[in-house]
Amino acid sequence: MLDWRLASAHFILAVTLTLWSSGKVLSVDVTTTEAFDSGVIDVQSTPTVREEKSATDLTAKLLLLDELVSLENDVIETKKKRSFSGFGSPLDRLSAGSVDHKGKQRKVVDHPKRRFGIPMDRIGRNRLSNSRG
């Protein structure tokens, strides 16, 4: 079954290739293709003018934005900054370190230090001697 499919696929490709090489696959008139080619050339030639115009517009806009940003950076804030961080305070005046994360806070309980008995050696049978040596 697979051999039949492979043979038919090769036959269809061979027929398509022969028709395409003879020019009978697409029934498109030569005048239509010439008109299409000239339209493509016209469309390709106009974007260069449009691209130049848009490039100059973009550079002008970028220069204007750059100037506005530099003017904004030069302005000194006269309003007093709030000393607390919370809801209602402007986001640009909050520092990242002052933001409190709301969540479950666990109480830290100080446990008294556990005192173990007499120190044992590794095996645990004999007491360690207090004398050196």
Curated annotation (Swiss-Prot):
<feature type="signal peptide">
    <location>
        <begin position="1"/>
        <end position="27"/>
    </location>
</feature>
<dbReference type="GO" id="GO:0003416">
    <property type="term" value="P:endochondral bone growth"/>
</dbReference>
<dbReference type="GO" id="GO:0045668">
    <property type="term" value="P:negative regulation of osteoblast differentiation"/>
</dbReference>
<comment type="subunit">
    <text>Interacts with NPR3.</text>
</comment>
<dbReference type="GO" id="GO:1903860">
    <property type="term" value="P:negative regulation of dendrite extension"/>
</dbReference>
<keyword id="KW-0027">Amidation</keyword>
<keyword id="KW-0372">Hormone</keyword>
<dbReference type="GO" id="GO:0007166">
    <property type="term" value="P:cell surface receptor signaling pathway"/>
</dbReference>
<keyword id="KW-0732">Signal</keyword>
<dbReference type="InterPro" id="IPR021088">
    <property type="entry name" value="Osteocrin"/>
</dbReference>
<dbReference type="GO" id="GO:0009755">
    <property type="term" value="P:hormone-mediated signaling pathway"/>
</dbReference>
<keyword id="KW-0217">Developmental protein</keyword>
<keyword id="KW-0221">Differentiation</keyword>
<dbReference type="GO" id="GO:0005615">
    <property type="term" value="C:extracellular space"/>
</dbReference>
<feature type="modified residue" description="Arginine amide">
    <location>
        <position position="132"/>
    </location>
</feature>
<keyword id="KW-0165">Cleavage on pair of basic residues</keyword>
<dbReference type="Pfam" id="PF11037">
    <property type="entry name" value="Musclin"/>
</dbReference>
<dbReference type="GO" id="GO:0046325">
    <property type="term" value="P:negative regulation of D-glucose import"/>
</dbReference>
<comment type="similarity">
    <text>Belongs to the Osteocrin family.</text>
</comment>
<protein>
    <recommendedName>
        <fullName>Osteocrin</fullName>
    </recommendedName>
</protein>
<comment type="function">
    <text>Hormone that acts as a regulator of dendritic growth in the developing cerebral cortex in response to sensory experience. Induced in the brain following membrane depolarization and inhibits dendritic branching in neurons of the developing cortex. Probably acts by binding to natriuretic peptide receptor NPR3/NPR-C, thereby preventing binding between NPR3/NPR-C and natriuretic peptides, leading to increase cGMP production.</text>
</comment>
<keyword id="KW-0964">Secreted</keyword>
<dbReference type="GO" id="GO:0030154">
    <property type="term" value="P:cell differentiation"/>
</dbReference>
<dbReference type="GO" id="GO:0005102">
    <property type="term" value="F:signaling receptor binding"/>
</dbReference>
<dbReference type="GO" id="GO:0005179">
    <property type="term" value="F:hormone activity"/>
</dbReference>
